[in-house]
C-alpha cells in the first residue's frame, strides 16, 4: 500500500495529496485544542462527528449555489476536496455576544447583536491570530478589495443559511468561523468556502435551555463534548441514536 504524501497538518486536520490532480484528502483528527493550542486533548470520536457534520453543511451549501471546496465524503474520517489557495484569514460572523466579543466590549453573554457582525483575523499561530481590518488585508496583500467583497458576501449567505438550518432543529447560531480560498479553474478564479464548518468552529446553543453544543464545552472544562456533537448530528438527521463513532486510526484511500 502506498502512503499518501502529507501536504499539511493543522491542529484538527491533515491534508493529503488527492487521487486526482487538483484534489486533496482532508482527514479529521480527534485532537481538541483551545487558546491557540495551549490547551490540548485527544477526544475519541470527535473527528468522525466533525467530518459528518461538515459534510452535511457543505453539501447543502453546494446545493443552494454557495461555492465550496467540498466534493464528497470518502469514509468516516476523510473528505475529498478541491485544492484551493487558502486566504490567510479567519472570517468570524457573530449574531449573539459571546467569547472574545463579549469580553472585549463588556457585553453580557447572550445579548442579541443589533445586526450580524463580520470580523477578520490573520491566520498566524505565533501571533495568536490577531484581529485585522480591511485596511490591513489590502495593505499587506492578503486579499484584494474585490476578494474582500466576495468573502463578505459569502459570509452573509452562509450565515443566513446556517441560522435557518439550526433554528429549524432548535439550535441558535451564536457565531461561527469560516475560511475561504481561491479556486482556479483554467484562467478563471473564484472565492469558495473552505476548511470546515462544525461545532469546532461555531457556537451552537440549545434554544430552550441555552446548553452549549460546541467546543466551548472543551474550552470551559464542561465535559460532554462528544455527546454535544452527537446531539447536533442527531438533530441534523445524519446520525442515528445507535450510530456512535468508534475510535479508529487513519484510513488510507487506495
From Swiss-Prot:
InterPro entries given in the database record: SAICAR_synt/ADE2_N, SAICAR_synt_PurC, SAICAR_synth, SAICAR_synthetase, SAICAR_synthetase_CS
Gene Ontology molecular function, alphabetical: ATP binding; phosphoribosylaminoimidazolesuccinocarboxamide synthase activity
CDD domains reported for this sequence: SAICAR_synt_PurC
Any one GO cellular component localisation term in the record: cytosol
Superkingdom to which the source organism belongs: Bacteria
PROSITE patterns xrefs: SAICAR_SYNTHETASE_1
Gene Ontology terms describing biological process: 'de novo' IMP biosynthetic process; cobalamin biosynthetic process
Broad enzyme group: ligase
Pathway(s) this gene product operates in, as recorded in its UniProt entry: Purine metabolism; IMP biosynthesis via de novo pathway; 5-amino-1-(5-phospho-D-ribosyl)imidazole-4-carboxamide from 5-amino-1-(5-phospho-D-ribosyl)imidazole-4-carboxylate: step 1/2
Pfam families: SAICAR_synt
Keyword Isomerase among UniProt keywords: no
Catalysis performed (reactions): 5-amino-1-(5-phospho-D-ribosyl)imidazole-4-carboxylate + L-aspartate + ATP = (2S)-2-[5-amino-1-(5-phospho-beta-D-ribosyl)imidazole-4-carboxamido]succinate + ADP + phosphate + 2 H(+)
Database matches in PANTHER family: MULTIFUNCTIONAL PROTEIN ADE2 (PTHR43599), SI:DKEY-6E2.2 (PTHR43599:SF3)
Protein name as catalogued: Phosphoribosylaminoimidazole-succinocarboxamide synthase
Organism: Brucella abortus (strain 2308)
The organism's taxonomic lineage, starting at the top: Bacteria, Pseudomonadati, Pseudomonadota, Alphaproteobacteria, Hyphomicrobiales
Name of the coding gene: purC
